[in-house]
Amino acid sequence: MKRQFAKIKIAAENLSRSSKSDSKDSELEAIERQVDRYRDTIEKIVRKLPALSGGGGSGSGSSEEQDKRTKKNSHYKIAQALDESAKELPKDMPLQKVLANCGELEKTMAECIIESELETEAKVVRRLKNILDKEIQEISTLKRNVSRTLQEYTSLKRSHEAAIRLEEPAAKVNHIKSQQEECELKLEKERDAWAAQMLELIAKEDEIVSCIRDYVLNQRNYHERALQHVNASLARIQDTIQGTEKSRFGTSLKEHLTSTNREISYIVELCCCCLLEHGLEEEGLLRVGCASTKLRRMKHALEAQHVKTPLPLDYQDPHVIGSILKLYLRELPEPLLTYNLYKDFIRIAERHSEAERKTEIKAILTKLPKENYANLRYLTRFLSIVQQRSALNKMSSQNLAIVMSPNMLWPRIDKSSNAPADYIGQVNSSSAANIIVELLISQWDYFFIGEVEFYLTLQKQKLFVEGKSKSNSSNENLDRNDSEVMESPRYGTLRRQKANAPSPPTTNGNGIIMTTSQTSHRPHAKELFPQQTPEKQEKPAKPPLPNLPQFQSPAASQPTQTQLEPLPPPPVTPAKPVPMTRTQFFGLDNLPSPTADRKSTDSIGSFKLKPDVPQKPLLPKRPTVLGVGVPKADGKSDDEGGTTPTQATIDNGNGSVRFKTEHFLDKLRQENGETNGTREVSSTTKENNHNHDPPATAADQNQQQAQPQVTTPISPNSFQTPKRPTVPAPPPPTNWKSSD
């Protein structure tokens, strides 16, 4: 038991110490650290470089893999987008050619990239990965063997020491010792193999360096191939640009003429020919400006090559064409008379004799470049023709020189310097340029020889759209005296498509409408009013007049015989009784309304408004006698309150009511037995008087007229409520006769 316990103790010690590495000498530790650095470097390079394809690099089976990888490349996707854009454009456009060329270049670049990646995988990544898989893996295996043998050797060594300490038999101690010696020899061999393998890897450092060098060479080859394709594509693009017509505005005259293979600038020829054909008689030609929007529109249309002959209607205004000519000359990088000869022209202008000026100008014109001389000759000939029509266009040679000289000669301006502008020099130079240009226009035959052919590339009489107005000038129709109605010219816009509204038919002096036969001699009348058979429309019958009251009818003004005859009495309808209110019962309806005690200086908010008591209508009283009450001075009776007809109303009705009343009274007297004509109050009359008032007399009536009626004072601060209208009673009969 004691021996077994000792063995278990030794095994436990060995087990606890198995993870601990044996102490190494300094040489192996340094070699191992260097190998670890190599391993880390190679692993990073292999991880970052393109991964190996499944096909194994080059070979017959790698073409499909290469195509798949090419289509996944970003350059190939860009090429597809460029090709799609190029297909949507016409083939004669420079942009379409450039897009197609760039698409081919991007595809080639994608193929070059994939080829470079495959070469990198084959020449660099494969070799580095072989070092990792073989060399580094072998070193790791040897290292594990050394660690295992070292652990075994340590265990045997401790067992030998324990056997000696426990005084084991000699045979057993010798056996353990022999095992220890054999393990030690094995450990030394494995250490040597491990060290040799690591040193071999270190010796292969040149191979690792050569792999990196091959990667760089591969990159150079890729960029060289790509550069060749880029240069070839760039050359084709440059040829396309050279074959394309340059932008006309802001381009040097020589470059524009070279790219278009012309002798005269296209803008100069187009403007001059258009103005020669339609515009020489335009007043203020080349002097009158135009709208900036129309100028910009035509300029950019010419730059975009959107405007071609025949010119559309929007680009036929002679003032716009003249402004385009001046703008083109002004935007040239170098003036038409050049910077080099600027001082010579200024010096010539200082000569006092015109003959000396002409001689020196003719000598200096020979120094102009060929392109400038040809265009100057062409332009000045056109200006001289315009000057010949100065009686119509009001543009003499002096006026033309003032307008055109700033666009043909100006000094060089140094934009880099911060020196102040020489305004005096600019004024002097402009006056000198006016003198030079005026001589070139007025004395054109002296400076130039031969005649100018204006229509070099354009066709005469085909510069404008046929069937439409070829001139939009402002004085086109000033001299017409015909009677035909003309529409106002519309400049730069299409004519109205919608037909105009027809004018009303004309009338003669008597207000009679003229028929189509009377206006048949007028062409515009025929157009507006075509001859048609007029249909007679029947006039509707007049409606019958409304039933008016008898006192408002026209016949009421003159009493007829039928009005004087007795008429049957109208049916008597009793008046509807009006209930008496509480206010009327107590006699409070005639009390004055309380008003606000305020001064003129008080504000509206300094007192409280006291509204008036609502006024109730008076209960109508029946007359004391059956007759019409005597009218008062104000034309109102006591019982009617201004609602029943008064005597004035009867008189205004021209006696119509009076005749009816007399007839009714006569019949009433006959029924009551009143034959003597005296006014006696009957019992019937007294019974009908519910107020039991005595009969009204003339004195009472005068007293009532003199007695003032109590009224409610109305103040501006009181609120009045409208009175309820009273129900008028029918006019009762009277027992008195009229005086007539």
Swiss-Prot record:
Compositional bias of kind Basic and acidic residues: 659-672
Transmembrane parts of this sequence: none
Domain BAR: 13-246
Record CDD domains: RhoGAP_nadrin (cd04386)
GO MF, one example: SH3 domain binding
Its job: GTPase activator for the Rho-type GTPases by converting them to an inactive GDP-bound state.
Phylogenetic placement of the source organism: Eukaryota, Metazoa, Ecdysozoa, Arthropoda, Hexapoda
Phosphoprotein among keywords: yes
Modified residues (Phosphoserine): 469, 473, 593, 715, 738-739
Organism annotation: Drosophila melanogaster (Fruit fly)
Family annotation (SUPFAM superfamilies): BAR/IMD domain-like, GTPase activation domain, GAP
A single GO BP: signal transduction
A family per Pfam: BAR
Protein name according to UniProt: Rho GTPase-activating protein 92B
Biased composition range(s): Polar residues: 506-520, 643-655, 673-686
Domain Rho-GAP: 251-448
Phosphothreonine modification, residue list: 595, 721
Site (Arginine finger) location in chain: 287
